[in-house]
Amino acid sequence: MNNTNKLIITIVCLVIIITIVEMYIRRKYAWAKISKAEEDAKKIKEDAKREAETLKKEATLEAKEEAHRLRSDLDKETRERRNEIQRLERRNLQREETLDKKNDLLEKRENGLNERENSIQERQNTIEQLYKEEREKLEQLSGLTSEEAKNLLLEEVNREIKHEKSIMIKEVEQKAKEEADKKAREIITYAIQRCAADHVAESTVYVVSLPNDEMKGRIIGREGRNIRAIETLTGVDLIIDDTPEAVILSGFDPVRREVAKVALEKLILDGRIHPARIEEMVEKAKKEVENNIKEEGEQATFETGVHGLHSELTRLLGRLKYRTSYGQNVLKHSIEVSYLAGFMAAELGIDPTFAKRAGLLHDIGKAVDHEVEGPHALIGAEVSKKYHELPLIVNAIGAHHGDVEPQSLEAILVQAADAISAARPGARRETLEAYIKRLEKLEEIANSYEGVEKSYAIQAGREIRIMVKPETVDDAGSIEMARGIVKKIEEQLEYPGQIKVNVIRETRAVEYAK
């Protein structure tokens, strides 16, 4: 037990000793660490102080360098400004010297001008005195006062100016007219050359071929009931005469005549001809003709490039295929007018769209004018207005025969194109005998005047050129003769459109060099 206690005491003593030793070692280590930290801090402080001194020296040096640089820049700028000021001073000094010289020169010129002015004034006084003396002498010699002489001179000058002005105006008007006529001829010629429309002249009758003459009896029917049915349903006269294998359809309305023709051809092809069958075929023919009318109208708009027409206007346009004017097919005529108006508009630098549209529709009134009273131009204008055509188009349609005043260049172009298409030789039919007689009568009227050497009726009788003897008829007589011939033509002849009377007087001077 005692040994155990001793061992415990020994262990406790050892633990205490070890603890004390450990504490001593730790304290010594802490003191060493603190001493080292103090040394490090002192060293850092010294380093910081040295670095601060270094930075201070560097900053001081940089500040001195910057101050030196700024002082140098300032000195440089000061020198430059001083030089600029000196340069400006020299320049101002030069300007002052120049101004002084100019002032001296101006003074000299002013003195010279004053001297010249005095000299001129003296001369003017002398001239006025001489003028006064001369005027008094002239008044004494002429017996006129200065005011009277002045008025007389002004009147003479006015007369001369008026005469020269009249001559100049006449020359300008003549030149303008010649140039305008030349340009108009070029435009019209170009338009006609580009337009080559085929015209088919139609009459008021159709001839329908028959397979044999026995068919005539079947068409007539028992007691004429078949022929009466055809005439009643179509409104067209059937003429059955001795013409072999043919019957003639005669009617004023070309659409009805076409319906009768189509119906009769169908009946002949079918072979069954009786009133009920006739009625059936007439109805089919009406539908077929109506379809053809619509197709013709659409084809016309396609050919001319006119789009956006109301369907009713297109139908009326197609009806014109079955209308003629002096033998000229109205639809073909309308297409030609559309082309001509478009070509002329393009030549004049105008958009041809409206001119072509108005030209195509200009005779649309002929498709309905047998149903409505009034001139076809005004009827066409009303119809086009009803179907919402532009006022420009409506006016061009109404004005193409002068029933209303044209309000646009397109309207005038449509008038011109209509006249060109109608006046073109061969476009409208006229009996040969009446044509020749009219030309002979024209030349006969011209040749009846004294002094006429020869005359020629040209351009299908629309112009007559008369060559007169210059020794018998003078210029004034030529004008009087032209008026007299025009009056006789108007009194003695009937003619479409107008006739131009052209009296030509030519004087030639011929000499021979020997």
Curated annotation (Swiss-Prot):
Region (Disordered) residue spans: 50-82, 99-119
Locations listed in the record: Cell membrane
Residue ranges occupied by any HD domain in the UniProt entry: 330-423
Signal peptide as annotated in the record: none
One annotated Gene Ontology cellular component of this protein: plasma membrane
Domain KH: 204-289
Known EC number: 3.1.-.-
Entries under SMART domains matching the protein: HDc (SM00471), KH (SM00322)
One GO BP annotation of this record: mRNA catabolic process
Topological relation to the membrane, as annotated: Single-pass membrane protein
Residues spanning the membrane: 5-25
Main localization of the protein described in the UniProt heading: membrane
InterPro entries: HD/PDEase_dom, HD_domain, HDIG_dom, KH_dom, KH_dom_type_1, KH_dom_type_1_sf, Ribonuclease_Y, RNase_Y_N
Keywords from the named record: Cell membrane, Endonuclease, Hydrolase, Membrane, Nuclease, RNA-binding, Transmembrane, Transmembrane helix
Gene Ontology MF terms in the entry: RNA binding; RNA endonuclease activity
Classification via SUPFAM superfamilies: Eukaryotic type KH-domain (KH-domain type I), HD-domain/PDEase-like
Enzyme category, top tier: hydrolase
Keyword set includes DNA-binding: no
Pfam families recorded: HD, KH_1, RNase_Y_N
Similarity annotation: Belongs to the RNase Y family.
Stated role: Endoribonuclease that initiates mRNA decay.
Protein name: Ribonuclease Y
Protein source organism: Clostridium acetobutylicum (strain ATCC 824 / DSM 792 / JCM 1419 / IAM 19013 / LMG 5710 / NBRC 13948 / NRRL B-527 / VKM B-1787 / 2291 / W)
